[in-house]
Amino acid sequence: MQQNTNVDPQEIAKFERMAETWWDLNGEFKPLHLLNPLRLNYIDQTAGGIFGKKVLDVGCGGGILSESMARIGAIVHGLDMGEEPLEVARLHALETGVSINYVKNTAEAHREDHREYYDVVTCMEMLEHVPDPLSVIQACCDMVKPGGFVFFSTINRNIKSFVETIIGAEYLLKMLPIGTHDHNKFIKPSELMALVDNTDLLCKDALGITYNPLTGIFKYTPKVDVNYMIATQKVD
C-alpha cells in the first residue's frame, strides 16, 4: 500500500473522538503521559542525543512525544492523519511556546519529498493501527539518513497482552476507552523484526515496558511480552 491508502478510517475516527482530552493528564491519554518519559529517554540515549537533530514523529497524534523531543532541542516534524488531534497538537504547541511543524499526511506520501532527510524517525504505538505495517516501516526507513535511527513501539500478541491491555487497561482499570485496541492487530517482536528485515534497517535493541497498577508507574523491563520498543539503525 502506498500514499494515502494505508489508513484505517475507523482508527482515525477513534482518535478524532478523543482528541480534546489529549493533554488532560488524568484523562484518556494518561497512560501515554506516564509512559512518555521512558520513551523520550530511550530515544535520546540510544540515538546519542537528539539535540539539534531533525526528528520525524510518525503517528504523532496530539503531540505528547513530539513536544517532549522539541523541548530538549530536537527539530521536530509531527505527522498524523487525524485533523482533530493535529489541531490539538498545534494549539498546545502555541500555548507552550514549542516550535513543531505538524503535517497531515501518511508516512508513505511524506516520504516523496523527504528521502534520507531525518536523523531520527519515531513511530510509537502506531503500527497496530494501520492495515499494512510494512509499508509504514519501509517509508520510515526511506526517510531516515544512512546511520540514522528509527524507533518503533507496539504491543505483543499473546494471552498476557490481551489480559493486561484490553481486559485490564480498558475494562477493569478504565485507563483507556473500550475498543482502543484490537488484539488481532498486535504484533509479536519476531514479526516486527521480520518486517524490519525487509528494509535497510538493522535492529539494534529491544526493550519492554511494564506497568504496575498499584503504584501507577511504568518502568523498563527486559521482557517484551506486552509493551515493547525496538531501536533500529539504517545501514550506511
UniProtKB/Swiss-Prot annotation:
Binding residues for S-adenosyl-L-methionine: 39, 59, 80, 124
GO biological process terms on file: methylation
Alphabetical list of Pfam families matching this protein: Methyltransf_23
Role of this protein: O-methyltransferase that catalyzes the 2 O-methylation steps in the ubiquinone biosynthetic pathway.
Keyword Transferase (UniProt): yes
Catalytic activity: a 3-demethylubiquinol + S-adenosyl-L-methionine = a ubiquinol + S-adenosyl-L-homocysteine + H(+); a 3-(all-trans-polyprenyl)benzene-1,2-diol + S-adenosyl-L-methionine = a 2-methoxy-6-(all-trans-polyprenyl)phenol + S-adenosyl-L-homocysteine + H(+)
Class of the enzyme per the UniProt entry, highest EC level: transferase
A single GO molecular function term of this UniProt record: 2-polyprenyl-6-hydroxyphenol methylase activity
Keyword annotations of the record: Methyltransferase, S-adenosyl-L-methionine, Transferase, Ubiquinone biosynthesis
Gene: ubiG
Pathway of action: Cofactor biosynthesis; ubiquinone biosynthesis
Family per similarity comment: Belongs to the methyltransferase superfamily. UbiG/COQ3 family.
Protein name (Swiss-Prot/TrEMBL): Ubiquinone biosynthesis O-methyltransferase
EC number: 2.1.1.222, 2.1.1.64
